[in-house]
Every structure is written in C-alpha cells, then in structure tokens.
UniProtKB/Swiss-Prot annotation:
Position of the signal peptide: none
Pfam annotation, one family: SecA_SW
Name this polypeptide is given: Protein translocase subunit SecA
Organism: Shewanella oneidensis (strain ATCC 700550 / JCM 31522 / CIP 106686 / LMG 19005 / NCIMB 14063 / MR-1)
Summary of subunit composition and partner proteins: Monomer and homodimer. Part of the essential Sec protein translocation apparatus which comprises SecA, SecYEG and auxiliary proteins SecDF-YajC and YidC.
C-alpha cells in the first residue's frame, strides 16, 4: 500500500523514464519544420555528415535527435508515413539497451527503422532479428526503400544462402534475418577452415522483434550442429582384417634387443605401439589392399586419418576383451564399467574405438551422431555489444529480461487511447458446454457483422472447432502454426465484416488485422492499378471499416487459457489496435488443462453446489484471479528451468569462448611457431616429470621408460642412461634442458629439410585439426557429464558445484591433450613438400563435406541433464488426472514417490 502511495506521488519508474525521453522527442519535433525544407539531396547527405561527426569523436546520443528527425522526414517522403511521438519514444528505448513494450498495431516495424539507422551509422552492422523467414523478407523489403534513400544497404540472412551471399548480407549496413540463422552462422564461423570462410562480422547491435518469443519461449532450446561422419563401416571392416596378421612383441626394441614382433603393449597406459618392422608390415598390407599408394607412408601428412583407424583397430584387438571391458548383447557392443562391473548402455568410446570393437565382433557398425557445435540463444545474444528488443507483451516477463539479459523493460504508451473491452472469463463445467457457448457467441457476432478471431492453444482444438462450424454451416478460415504467405493474407483480411478466423495462438503474429480488411493488399493484387481503381478500393474499404466499427470492432474469442499470461495478452492484443473498437473474452471449462491441474475439485464442487445447470457459466473476478495465480505458478516454474539451464550452459559457454577465441587467433595468425615452441617445452617437461619426478633422488628415476616414451611419442632416440653414466654432474634440471634442446634441434632439422613456410602452414593445419577433434570429443564428454550429474545429489553433493568442478577438470584435460597430441604429430609426421600440406587440407575438407550436418534445436532437458532441482521441477510438471480421486496422503500419481499433498496436491 505504501509503495502504491509513493508511485502516485512520484510516478512509476516507467513514467520517469518516459519523461526523460520526452525531452528528446520535443527536440526532434522542433527540427521537423527545418528538415521539411531540405531537398532530397540535402536530406540524403545527412548520412555522410553523421558518419563524419562520429569519426571525429561524437557519440550516438549527441546525434540521436537529428538522426531520428532525418529518418522521420525520409519516411514521410518515401512511405508517406510519419513516425508518431510514441514511435520516437520506442526508438529511443531500443537504442538504450532496453526492451520496448509496444501494443499490437503501434507500428513496431516502422519504429525499428529509427535505432537501426542510428546504429548503422557506426559502420559496424545492425542485425534486425525476426521469428521466421517470411517476416525477415517482408520487413527487409518493406524498409529497403527508406534505408536506400538514406544511403544505407540492406541484407537478408535466411537459410539456404551460399557463402558469398551470406557475406554480402552481413556486410550490409542493416541485416534482417531469423534468430536460428544468426545463431547457426556464429557456430559455422567457428568451424571454418580459413578466415575467408567466416561470414559474420563482430557482433555489434541486435534488435529483436517479438523479443519475448525468442529470448524467453525459445531460450530453453539450444542450437546444435551435429553430424554423423560418412558411413566408414567398410573402412573399419577392411582394417579389422589386417590385425590378425600382426604379431605381438614382449618388449620395446633397443640397442641390446631387436625383436621380431610388430607391436608392443603398454598395459599400464592402455596403449599399443608399432615397431619399425610392424609399421612396414602394415604399410605393405594396406598397399596390397589398395588402401595406400605404392611408396606412400602411413605417417605421411595426408594419412593421419588412416593411422587413427589402424591404431583404433589394434587397440580393439589387443587391449579390449569381450565380457571384461564390454559385452555383446542384441547385436550391440555395450561398455562394462571397469569399477562397478555394470553395463553402460548408450555410452560409446571415442576416437573410433567403439566402431573398431564393433568391426572386431562382427556386429553392425554404428555411426555416431556427434555434436560439432552448440549454443543457447541466451548465450548467443549476450555476445552482442548492444542488445534491444520489442514486443507487444513484455511487462509480465520484465524480471526475467532484467535478471538474465540485463535488459530493462519500458512500456511505451499507445498513440491513441485503448478502447478495447476485455470481458471477464466465462467458466463452464464441461468442454462440450464451452464449445456450444463459443458457437453461439460466433453466430451472434456474425449477425451483427462483427469479425471474430478465435484463438486456440493447439491445432487439434482448432480442427475440432472447425468441424463444429462446418456442422453449423458457419463460413470460416483456419490457420495452423505453420507460417507462410497465404497465412499473412488470411490474417490481414480477418477484420472484414462477419469474418470468422480460427488460429492457434501464435499463428499470424507480425501481421496487423485491419478493420474492414487490408485495402493495401487488394491494391497490390492488381497489375498497374489506376488512380480510379485505388480510390474505389479505398472507398469500399471505408464503408466496410465503418460497418465493422459500428458492430463493435474485432472480437477476440479465447477457447482456453494458456499457461502463460503473456500468450493470452498477445491474443487479446490482436484487437483494439490504434484506438480501434474491439472486445475480448475467454471461454473456459473445468476440463481445460490449466483448470484441471490448478483449479482442483473444490472449484467444480462449488459450481455444482451453486446448482448450476448445463450450459450455465460462472463469471466472477475471484475465478479470474485464481486462474491468474495458477498462471503465475507455471511462469515461475518455467523461469526456474530457464535459469537453471543458463547456470549449466554458462560453464560450457566460458569454455566455448576460450576455444573459439583460440581458434580464431590460430586462423588469423601468419605463424604459430612461438606457440609451438612454448607448448613443446610444456609437453616434453610433463613427460619427463612422469619418469623423473622433480627434486627426486636418482634411484627413483625410470630412465629406460623415459627413453622408450620419448622414442615412441616424439621420435627422439636419446642415450639418456649413457649420458648419466658418463657425466656425474648431469643433474635433473640440466638433463631436462638437454632433452628439450634435442627435440628443438630435431625439429629445426625437419624445418630445414621441408622449408619454414611449409612447416608453418603444416603447424597451423595440425593445431586446428587436433583442436577441432578434441573439442568435439569434449562436447560429447560434457553431454555425458551433464546427463548423470544429478546423481551426485544422492552423495550429498551439490550437482551444480560438481558439474563446474568436473567440467573444469575435463577442460584442463582437453588443453593438456591438445598440447601433447600436436607435438606428438609434428614429431612423427613426415612432410616432404607444400603439396603434402595441401593434400592434408584437401582430405580434411573432403571429410568435412561428407559430414551429414544436422541443424537442430535440442530438447532443453538434454542440455540440462538432471539437477538437485529436478524434484522441484517434477513437482510442478502438469499432470492429467484420469483415474479415481487421489487422497491427500496417497502416493502422488506423477511417480515422484512423495505424498500427493507434498507434490501435485500443493497446487490444488
């Protein structure tokens, strides 16, 4: 009460914000007379003038009033449309990292031209984001004449464009497109092979239309690029046949011992290594089978992939034993947990090992559908330097916009007072009674000539109503959720006299319903219309418009309450645009999902006690309040889920940004020789530490093991034991330096042989290829971690903290493995000439082209996995009760294991 009193005296925060912005509106209005006197050329020259001032150090705020006045004047000349003062207010809100709530019909598309023009003057690009391709194309084409008049370029970014078309779209001053396409382009850019393949510029300013739909409704669905590599089962099968020809050797070759085997096994490290004899034998076998060219080496740059396959097959045969490490069940290889002995269905080994085991066992080889890249909309849009959005319904979600995106919501007043009548809900006992009442209301409206828009929550419900209308011989149009051009036409004509249109709640969003029908569309349908034809169409429309207004304007009829108040408000907002007449009413029944879950038996019991007969409805503010409270509960639950998703994804997002930044630096750098030098010191030192622990006595050193490891992994054949025997003063630190220097000398010799430029290019190619491969494996490991993390709760641990800790360990592992693998490959692989590097790049591109990429929205639940909040979420999950009444102390039918009163009964 005290808060309401303060608001009355000082005004709300929204009022104070608008009051501050009104001063700038007054400035823009004061400039209007002067700008009207400018010629077209003088008005167009304003763009160059503003750009010069910005280059000289002026701020966008300092030129805002003049820039907005320029756009308003240009719009009057190009479109014969003048921005209202409220649209100027909306434009200023959108320029200041806020969300503008503007009612339906207030001209959001025209409002967006103001901040889009202002921010495009910086030359950094503006992205105007819509919910579908149709709206992106429509808005871009509608506004193109205005922007081009002012000397700006417009691009359209939709699915299916070629790389150059994408680049052109992004290089435009203002780019229209869908949220999905912008997100996927970001992911694709971070999978590019060269800087020339990237299409996006740095993310500067995003202006999101229908911001609630994109940042809230779709926030839980991450964008994922996944792909199954080409079907390489034939390759696994062929390589599998080579392994039985190979002979095991008990110990590594040395000066004292030269074995006759083909490979050795390091059981401790679970690794196998070819002997020189074995390498030659495998190469000969591959040449015999036509898998390797005559004279080619398995260790040449172009054959890295083949080498991986051979190693995987050898490991499958020698290190992994059936009924110990895995079992074969129903034609599938299932991993056995080495610690618990339990099977782990659904889990697969990486690096091609699982497929190699499948080939060994003769079962069907499955291609993994691997996540190549992923991001949530929440984290994608937070990458922009500036972010703003507009919608007709944001105020109910203002807290979420502020909490997650740091965006304040400002409710922009309507240009004309709202006169729509929002009538109280009518609640019936059964769905059948409700539908009969809806049909009666539609018939009454048709008799008066009043158009009706019937909003349903599902396609199934819209089809049911359509069948009832056919039965009653009521002419109507049905729209489902699939948006296409025809739908826009139907929605545009839904305001004609006596028209009846059934639409799912979201269908047709973005198209205004004009009372009397859309006369512009009628004119557009004619080829070269004469002024007389235009005048007749407009006169006919005026008669229809007046008749519809006299009948009460557009009547919105809701057939069920949505679980979100915002969606209900969107439906209501289709009527009463620009001060038009209109009305709205929701028809509900006790069988509706929301009522059945939340309103409980008490309400229907009360309705029966009131002696309500069939067909009678209850209409009371108390019922409307109860429904609103139910909706608040659902909204709160959904907010918790989105917040939880973000907390989990933030961990992955930090890692994603580190990897992508590193990748971009790699691609843009001319040489990464210094990086290679630094990591080789780290890698060799780490290997030495395993065999010669720092500051340890010589008795603890495993010198033969170190010699063997350096030879196997880095092709360094060093007589370390001999050095130690001959030089008494050779201590740990000087030995370390000598080994590192030996690697550097060997690498320099390789550089002199192949040439510095070839090796620099090869280093980049190896580093990128290794990083990409490990990142894909890391994403899979993160998925597995996320799916099982909620089980940590049973051990009295906080799943979120455990997820952060374990994912950090996985990331550290990724970085260490990256360093090790890059140095190992650079040590082993033989590069003869530039053509080897080019061949390696060509193979890599070929393999990438074979990936059947799948651009998809993942289920949010898969991204979250489980958590300590799972039970709380489960307790709020809508449940349909279709059996006997559940007692308060009975187990809840949802399966949570709790008593009904402590679970879904809480909501009754």
């Amino acid at each position: 009460m005290f808060g309401k009193l303060l608001t009355k005296v000082f005004g709300s925060r929204n009022d104070r914000t608008l009051k501050g912005l009104q001063k700038v509106v007054n400035k823009i209005n004061a400039l209007e007379a002067d700008y009207e006197k400018l010629t077209d050329e003088q008005l167009k020259a304003k763009t160059a003038e503003f750009r010069e001032r910005l280059a000289a150090g002026a701020s966008l705020d300092s030129i805002m009033a003049e820039a907005f006045a320029t756009v308003r004047e240009a719009s009057k000349r190009v479109f014969e449309m003048r921005h209202f003062d409220v649209q100027l207010l909306g434009g200023m809100v959108l320029d200041s990292n806020r969300i503008a709530e503007m009612r339906t019909g207030e001209g959001k598309t025209l409002t967006a031209t103001l901040p889009a023009y202002l921010n495009a003057l910086t030359g950094k690009g503006v992205h105007v984001i819509t919910v579908n391709d149709y709206l992106a194309r429509r808005d871009a084409e509608n506004n193109r004449p205005l922007f081009e008049f002012l000397g700006l370029t417009v691009g359209i970014n939709v699915a299916g464009l070629g790389q150059q078309d994408k680049k052109d779209a992004y290089n435009a001053d203002i780019t229209y497109g869908t949220n999905n396409e912008f997100g996927f382009d970001y992911l694709r850019d971070n999978m590019a092979f060269s800087p020339q393949e990237r299409v996006q510029r740095p993310l500067h300013y995003a202006l999101i239309d229908e911001v609630d739909s994109i940042l809230i409704d779709e926030a839980r669905t991450p964008l994922i690029i996944s792909g199954a590599a080409e079907d390489s089962s034939e390759l696994y099968i062929k390589i599998n046949t080579l392994i039985p020809n190979l002979i095991r050797q008990d110990k590594e070759d040395s000066e004292e011992y030269v074995g006759e085997g083909d490979y050795t096994i390091d059981e401790k490290a679970k690794q196998v290594h070819f002997t020189e004899r074995g390498q030659e034998k495998v190469e000969n076998l591959l040449i015999e089978r036509g898998m390797l060219a005559e004279g080619d080496s398995l260790y040449s740059a172009a054959n890295i992939s083949l080498l991986h396959h051979v190693n995987a097959a050898l490991r499958a045969h020698t290190l992994f034993e059936r009924d110990v490490d895995y079992i074969v069940q129903d034609g599938e290889v299932i991993i056995v947990d080495e610690h618990t002995g339990r099977t782990m269905p659904g889990r697969r080994w990486s690096e091609g090992l699982h497929q190699a085991v499948e080939a060994k066992e003769g079962v069907r080889i499955q291609n993994e559908n691997q996540t190549l890249a992923s991001i949530t909309f929440q984290n994608y849009f937070r990458l922009y330097e500036k972010l703003a959005g507009m919608t007709g319904t944001a105020d109910t979600e203002a807290f979420e916009f502020q909490h997650i995106y740091g965006l304040d919501t400002v409710v922009v007043p309507t240009n004309r007072p709202m006169v729509r009548k929002d009538m109280a809900d009518l609640v019936y006992l059964t769905a059948n009674e409700k539908y009969q009442a809806i049909i009666k209301d539609i018939k009454d409206c048709r008799e008066r000539g009043q158009p009706v828009l019937v909003g349903t929550v599902s396609i199934e419900q819209s089809e049911l109503l359509a069948r009832l209308m056919v039965k009653e011989k009521i002419p109507h149009q049905v729209l489902n959720a699939k948006f296409h051009e025809k739908e826009a036409e139907i929605v545009a004509q839904a305001g004609r006299t006596g028209a009846v249109t059934i639409a799912t709640n979201m269908a047709g969003r973005g198209t205004d319903i004009v009372l009397g029908g859309n006369w512009n569309m009628e004119i557009d349908a004619l080829e070269n219309p004469t002024p007389e034809q235009k005048a007749k169409i407009k006169a006919d429309w005026q008669l229809r418009h007046d008749a519809v207004v006299a009948a009460g304007g557009l009547h919105i009829l809701g057939t069920e309450r949505h679980e979100s108040r915002r969606i209900d408000n969107q439906l209501r907002g289709r009527a009463g645009r620009q001060g038009d007449a209109g009305s709205s009413r929701f028809y509900l029944s006790m069988e509706d999902s929301l009522m059945r879950i939340f309103a409980s038996d008490r309400v229907s019991g009360m309705m029966k006690k009131l002696g309500m007969e069939e067909g009678e409805a209850i209409e009371h503010p108390w019922v409307s309040r109860a429904i609103e409270n139910a909706q608040r509960k659902v909204e709160a639950r959904n907010f918790d889920i989105r917040k939880q998703l973000l907390e989990f994804d933030d961990v992955a997002n930090d890692q994603r940004q580190v990897v992508y930044a590193q990748r971009n630096e790699l691609m843009d750098a001319e040489s990464i020789a210094d990086t290679i030098q630094n990591i080789q010191d780290d890698v060799i030192s780490a290997v030495i530490d395993q065999y010669i622990p720092p500051q340890s006595v010589e008795e603890l050193w495993d010198v033969p093991g170190l010699e063997q490891r350096l030879h196997q992994e880095f092709m360094l054949k060093l007589p370390i034991q001999e050095w130690l025997d001959k030089e008494d003063d050779l201590h740990e630190e000087s030995l370390r330096e000598r080994i590192i220097t030996s690697w550097s000398d060997a690498y320099k010799a390789k550089e002199e042989m192949v040439g510095a430029s070839v090796l620099r290019q090869f280093e980049k190619a190896v580093m990128l290829q290794t990083l990409d491969g490990l990142w894909k494996e890391h994403l899979a490991a993160m998925d597995h971690l996320r799916q099982g993390i909620h089980l940590r709760g049973y051990a009295q641990k906080n799943p979120k903290q455990e997820y952060k800790r374990e994912s950090f360990e996985l990331f550290q592992q990724l970085l260490n493995t990256l360093k090790h693998d890059v140095i190992s490959v650079l040590s082993k692989v033989q590069v003869q000439a530039q053509s080897d590097v080019e061949e390696m790049e060509a193979r890599r591109r070929e393999e990438d082209a074979k990936i059947q990429r799948d651009y998809q929205h993942a289920a949010a639940e898969a991204l979250v996995g489980g958590s300590d909040e799972d039970d709380a979420i489960a307790a709020h999950t809508p449940m349909i009760r279709d059996g006997d009444k559940v007692g308060r102390n009975d187990p809840c039918p949802c399966g949570s294991g709790r008593k009904y009163k402590q679970c879904h009964g809480k909501l009754s």
